[in-house]
Amino acid sequence: MKRNAAFIQILFSLGRLLGVVIACVMMASCQQKSKVEMTPWGTPVGGEADTIPTGFTLSDIQANGELIMLTLNGPDTYYDYRGRGMGLQFLLCERFAQQLGVKLRVEVCQDTTELLSRLKAGEGDVIAVPLPQRYQQLDYCGYSSTDSLKQMWAVLKNNTELADTLNRWFRPELVAEVKAEESFLLSTKSVTRRVYSPMLNRSGGIISRFDALFQKYAPVARWDWRLLAAQCYQESTFDPQARSWAGACGLMQIMPATATHLGLPHSQIFEPEPNIAAAAKYIAQLTTHFNDIPERNERCYFVLAAYNGGFFHIRDAMSLAQKNGRDPHRWDEVSDYVLKLSTPEYYRDPVVKHGYMRGSETVNYVAGIRNRWAQYRGFARAASAPGLTGTPRPAKRKNKYSI
């Protein structure tokens, strides 16, 4: 009996040991499977889906008349600046599209994974973001960074003609040329302004020769006509023929696309009355997007900011302010986050939907108009038409214009 009991105990121990061995083998097998190499589009290397598409060829792109650029939002890649695309990678890709004789379409992605998956799906032709050369399914071509970790644009591996054309087109000197161009454009002002702008007749309360038009169309915007005049001076210094490098036109610097949206014929965009009338209509439209701001003067500051920097960017700044415990309906608090939208920590925040913006220009724009409006109110009479009635508060922040 004792011998049988000992034998049974040995069998039991061997069984447990065998179980441990089997478990270890299974775990090792699982770990081996988890280390299977994946393609950039999320399929196992060597699997049925591990195929490399060719994408649209150069001939296809030229026949379609459009090059599709896949990129990320940021100051060095792509961002919207008053309706005009900016950023080093965008400007370079724009030049390449011009070389091909086609239009450029920009598709902004959230991250590298989306860049790669959309390229594979045929939703883009070139990834215009410097990528590290570690994806064998891509052809690296065109733009090349100069740092120690060489990074380049990319197309699909088998799209040889497009890759070769990009390589022949790209020259390292192009980067310096485009950087200089962008720097010049962003630093160029169409007019020189002063906070305390000259009035046509200070003693008579006459701001400009367009006062009658400001008074006529201020009720459309539901603004004080002197605020409309202050904005006009900021935009063009009362020059009806003013035109910015970005294409903004006339007294109120209306972009051609905005003019089309407002029903303003391009043939009339430089005419004072149609230009002011369209601007007043646009201001009224922007105002409806800020009806959640109860205080009227505060609302007008947000409208001014949206006129300059874009409605969606201002809404992003409001979301950031609210997230960080600030009042999203006070411009002096939201303007801090307009400024912060130029830093990655903030323009990549999950509540931000429209990415990077050059916030300093918009903050200075609003400050300049607020100060000028306060000056105009001291000398020019208010019109009888409805408009803003409260006394404007001076801008909290010192602005960049000299007196």
Regions inferred by a protein language model and the residue ranges of each:
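C-terminal motif of bacterial Sec signal peptides marking the signal peptidase cleavage site
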Residues: 26-29
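Extended ligand-binding regions for polar small-molecule ligands
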Residues: 31-32, 36-52, 87-99, 152-190, ...
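Low-complexity, Gly/Ser/Thr/Pro-rich intrinsically disordered linker/tail segments
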Residues: 361-403
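Catalytic and substrate-binding regions of cell-wall glycan-acting enzymes that process beta-1,4-linked
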Residues: 155, 301-375
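Acidic, polar ligand-binding/catalytic clefts
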Residues: 52, 59, 76, 94, ...
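Export/targeting segments at the very N-terminus of extracytoplasmic proteins
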Residues: 49, 189-238, 273-276, 291-294, ...
